[in-house]
């Protein structure tokens, strides 16, 4: 059996979809559904059982349950970069992740967990995952969420007792189906699509940094279908333990993303950006701490044998918009 924590969240439920696509149904989903619409992410999925995250430790005490686990895919976390309760973040993102690490080490099974590109902070030291643990330890996250993720990464490298294989995944800007419950934390594709459908245009921030035109701030946008394909590759192959960037390796601008989204939504490749993009002032409190560039170095991912071409921004956005956002049933 495979445990997927955060299994009703965006990446977790998309990974359950991927497992189902590969014929795997012996899955334990671990999550909290609460009052939001996360339950819709798993409505079409086939899996063995679901358990509340607060009850997993007790469930694993039973030897019959624990001995039946082949791997743990830990996508469960508080992923809100705006969360202010550091104790909650450390308990949820560090303590729980550590508990699952120790379980996988004891059982000698694979452990794949969600780190984050937020650990890189402003990117002063670059976005390179293929460096020593000592170099990774120098990273300076900008928020408590990023710190909670970095703290576990640093802890992991110090452990003598390790899972059979462990992979910490630094996700960059993931977009795609299953993110509808995330509200403000949903991707720019989701928000751009809804802005365009409602207003006929989108708003983008002006630039306050030399070398970047208005709306041309850059991010590494990666489609969730590519993300879960990489995760599946790591699950079924023996790959080197460690930290891996999960991105496309090619930064694109918010202008590119917005135009790709609106062109896909309108089925019109000739939209003029001057007519559908409104540039607005960036709030003053953001101007000094706004990231203008992120781009994953993915050489390390390629070196372990993952050679598939990922969706281009235009390909991924078109699939997401036309086959999901525009449909009555927008779920995988």
From Swiss-Prot:
Catalytic residues per the record?
Answer: 145, 182
| Positions of NADP(+) binding | 10-11, 31-32, 38, 53, 75-79, 92, 149, 174, 182
Query: One GO molecular function term?
Result: NADP binding
Cofactor field: NADP(+)
UniProtKB keywords: Carbohydrate metabolism, Isomerase, NADP
Quote the InterPro entries the UniProt record gives: Epimerase_deHydtase (IPR001509), Heptose_epim (IPR011912), NAD(P)-bd_dom_sf (IPR036291)
The UniProt annotation places substrate binding at 173, 184, 191, 205-208, 219, 290
Q: Which residues form the signal peptide?
A: none
The UniProt note on the cofactor reads as follows: Binds 1 NADP(+) per subunit.
Tell me, what is an example of a GO biological process annotation in this record? Answer: carbohydrate metabolic process
Q: Which HAMAP family match?
A: Heptose_epimerase
What is the stated purpose of this protein?
Answer: Catalyzes the interconversion between ADP-D-glycero-beta-D-manno-heptose and ADP-L-glycero-beta-D-manno-heptose via an epimerization at carbon 6 of the heptose.
Give the family this protein belongs to, as stated in its UniProt record.
Belongs to the NAD(P)-dependent epimerase/dehydratase family. HldD subfamily.
Protein name as catalogued: ADP-L-glycero-D-manno-heptose-6-epimerase
Q: Which gene encodes it?
A: hldD
């Amino acid at each position: 059996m495979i445990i997927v924590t955060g299994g009703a969240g965006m990446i977790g439920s998309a990974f359950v979809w991927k497992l189902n696509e590969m014929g795997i149904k012996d899955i334990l989903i671990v999550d909290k559904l609460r009052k939001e619409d996360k339950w819709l992410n798993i409505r079409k999925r086939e899996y063995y059982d679901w358990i509340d995250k607060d009850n997993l430790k007790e469930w694993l005490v039973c030897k019959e349950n624990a001995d039946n686990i082949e791997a743990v895919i830990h996508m469960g976390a508080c992923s809100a970069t705006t969360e202010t309760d550091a104790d909650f973040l450390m308990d949820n993102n560090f303590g729980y992740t550590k508990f699952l690490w120790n379980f996988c080490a004891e059982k000698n099974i694979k452990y794949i967990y969600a780190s984050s590109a937020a650990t890189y902070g402003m990117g002063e030291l670059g976005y390179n995952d293929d460096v020593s643990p000592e170099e990774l330890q120098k990273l300076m996250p900008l928020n408590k969420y990023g710190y909670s993720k970095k703290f576990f990464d640093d802890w992991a490298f110090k452990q003598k007792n390790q899972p059979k294989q462990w992979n910490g995944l630094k996700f960059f800007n993931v977009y795609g189906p299953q993110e509808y419950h995330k509200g403000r934390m949903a991707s720019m594709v989701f928000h751009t699509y809804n802005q365009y459908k409602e207003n006929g245009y989108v708003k983008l921030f002006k630039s306050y940094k030399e070398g970047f035109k208005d709306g041309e701030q850059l991010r590494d946008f990666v489609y969730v279908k590519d993300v879960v394909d990489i995760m599946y590759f790591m699950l079924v192959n023996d790959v080197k333990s460690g930290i891996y960037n999960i991105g496309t390796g090619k930064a694109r601008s918010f202008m590119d993303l917005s135009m790709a989204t609106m062109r896909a939504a309108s089925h019109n490749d000739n939209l003029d950006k001057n007519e559908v993009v409104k540039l607005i002032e960036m709030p003053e409190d953001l101007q000094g701490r706004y990231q203008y560039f992120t781009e994953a170095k993915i050489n390390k991912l390629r070196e372990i044998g993952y050679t598939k071409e990922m969706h281009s921004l235009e390909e991924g956005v078109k699939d997401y918009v036309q086959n999901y956002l525009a449909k009555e049933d927008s779920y995988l």
